[in-house]
Amino acid sequence: MSFFGFGQTAEIDIVLNDAETRKKVEHKTEDGKKDKYFLFYDGETVSGKVNVTLKTPGKRLEHYGIKIEFVGQIELYYDRGNHHEFVSLVKDLARPGELSQSQTFDFEFTHVEKPYESYTGQNVKLRYFLRATISRRLNDISKEMDIVVQTLCTYPEINSSIKMEVGIEDCLHIEFEYNKSKYHLRDVIVGKIYFLLVRIKIKHMEIDIIKRETTGTGPSVYHENDTIAKYEIMDGAPVRGESIPIRLFLAGYEMTPTMRDINKKFSVRYYLNLVLIDEEERRYFKQQEITLWRKGDIVRRSMSQQATIAAQRYEGSNPEPTSAQAKEETD
Amino acid sequence: MAEAIADTRRLYTKPQNLNDAYGPPSNFLEIDVTNPETVGVGRNRFTTYEIKLKTNLPIFKLKESRVRRRYSDFEWLRGELERESKVVVPPLPGKALFRQLPFRGDDGIFDDSFIEERRQGLEQFLNKVAGHPLAQNERCLHMFLQDESVDKNYTPSKIRQA
């Protein structure tokens, strides 16, 4: 109808109530570009306004209902038709009728569950978005607004180190050690490689971080490997008894938390690959999985709070914050 | 109290034994292909090369050895390794059949520059192969490098270290 210049059409605009204060983060889109989106956590309320602006003033807009949805869905690139929605909430904004002028509708999705982190990968995408729709006889008018969700963790209670002896019999024996098995995204991998037997001519050694995205189930499982980082840790030939230190700062690399079997649709796992290269370019390697997790931002506490905590932990210490210091530290 | 800065101190390491640190490395293996010599007369001539090996790897029976081999021996070795081991065997320098055709302006396969080119290729080939942990387990490699002559009727087998 609007095709021929007859009838009325409208523009939809979704605005969040806390748009001024809410943090925005960068997130990669499918074609590799980076855009900024509002950041939400699990359990947070999503509320705002839907502004419907009539294009042609004076004319009425007939509709079969106006609604807003909050959707969390997984999209497999090789199966575009099927979106797997794991969160789907609807709020009706207007019953079927007509709008004689531009109007604004309030909405609130209270304490929405957002179980998984937003992810845009090589073969799969998990996204959350608001979608406002004006239903009409021939064609609906709708507008989507993507948001980004991050899942936070606290320090894992158990975080054992990884220590293993590997090698090729009578040729090369090494013992490698990484200080933890679970690292947060801005952590440092501290480790060492200890040479027990070196009967080959090693030229250099590097440690790679590999991201493996797994999609599909059963017989049609597909792995996509991506080397996120290559970091040389040794140049030259080691001998028996030598220890090579590793210190790899993760903050410099673009990584996501480890995602295991998300909604039974996909996984994203990370591996450390230790690679030794000999004089004839032969490669000897050992892969080891690590778990990555996302840490919440550090909460800054006042000196008096910190002192109180310290007093509780260590017997006999006196919490004596000077009043001047306490004043400076309050945020 | 939340950590503001990660602990990046080195992990504990055992101090290295000074004999290990300053002694000879356990990976010493040197192979030279030298002294090409053409033997025979007329159509029955062929060139042999001296293969000198020095090593401290326990898998080699002799720590020093010296043998003479011809190109067809190298071809035999390559064939055996391809069949018996899972190694991707590097190529040999070319067979140069065209050089064996008559009416050439130079000495064909007995030309000095050709022999030198071939010598280099054979040396590269042997160094690549002899340093491979899997190739080192093959009887044929040890026979080629250290036995007086190559017995092409041998029984292929794997070497296990004592």
UniProtKB/Swiss-Prot annotation, chain A:
Main location: cytoplasm
GO biological processes: intracellular protein transport; retrograde transport, endosome to Golgi
Subcellular location: Cytoplasm; Membrane; Endosome
Highest taxon of the lineage: Eukaryota
Membrane topology: Peripheral membrane protein
UniProtKB keywords: Cytoplasm, Endosome, Membrane, Protein transport, Transport
Region ranges (Disordered): 310-331
Gene Ontology, cellular component aspect: cytosol; endosome; retromer complex
InterPro entries reported for this sequence: Arrestin-like_C (IPR014752), Vps26-related (IPR028934)
Family per similarity comment: Belongs to the VPS26 family.
PANTHER family registered for this protein in UniProt: VACUOLAR PROTEIN SORTING 26 RELATED
Quaternary state and interactors: Component of the heterotrimeric retromer cargo-selective complex (CSC) which is believed to associate with variable sorting nexins to form functionally distinct retromer complex variants.
Function: Acts as a component of the retromer cargo-selective complex (CSC). The CSC is believed to be the core functional component of retromer or respective retromer complex variants acting to prevent missorting of selected transmembrane cargo proteins into the lysosomal degradation pathway. Retromer mediates retrograde transport of cargo proteins from endosomes to the trans-Golgi network (TGN).
Protein name, as recorded: Vacuolar protein sorting-associated protein 26B
